[in-house]
UniProtKB/Swiss-Prot annotation:
It comes from the Eukaryota. Belongs to the MYCT1 family. May regulate certain MYC target genes, MYC seems to be a direct upstream transcriptional activator. Residues 172-181 have a biased composition (Polar residues). This is Myc target protein 1 homolog. InterPro entries: Myc_target_1 (IPR029180). It is found in: Nucleus. Transmembrane segments: none annotated. Residues 58-83, 172-198 are annotated as: Disordered. Keywords: Nucleus. Its main location: nucleus. A motif (Bipartite nuclear localization signal) lies at residues 52-72. One of its GO terms (cellular component) is nucleus.
Amino acid sequence: MATNVTVHNATCFSQALTEDFWDGVKLSFTVSIVIGLVIGGIIWTLVTCLSRRRASASISPRMPKSSSRRPRSSSHNHALNRSGFYRNSSCERRSNLSLASLTFQRQTSQEQTDPFTRKPSFRASTFHPFMQCPPLAVEADSQLVTLPRSNNTSPTANNTVNLSRPDFHWSNNSLRLGPSTQTPPPAYDSIIKAFPDS
């Protein structure tokens, strides 16, 4: 009898314990879900309010149209004026350099004109700032032949001053200093006609 009573009490206690346990689990689960939803709702409302305030703060303070356009246009004009100044100065420098090179080319081409009124040679038509045209020396049958150079003055300089320059002649791998009263070399076609074999 006593054993049956104890077994019956144990089963009743276990049943009551299991029912109470599951009821507590269900209650705690629902309470935790409710608390989580409440906390999440509060956080969501705070975030949305802060984002709306930031967005409205960046958009709402608008200046009048006339006052907002004036500083922009003045700064834009100032930047354009600066860029225009630099462009003008660079264009002036380039134009000055191109004019100087054109005058040098005209002087050299007019100084070395062809007496036969033919097309000037490549050396006479282009400007070589660091080249001084020595007279053309041609060896024919082991004899040194130099073409004469005329003393032409530049048309831009209105005086007849002859600037004597030493002329160099090459013969048998040796450098010789010659007189300065020789003419510039003629055009390439006349040289070929003068020396057809070479």
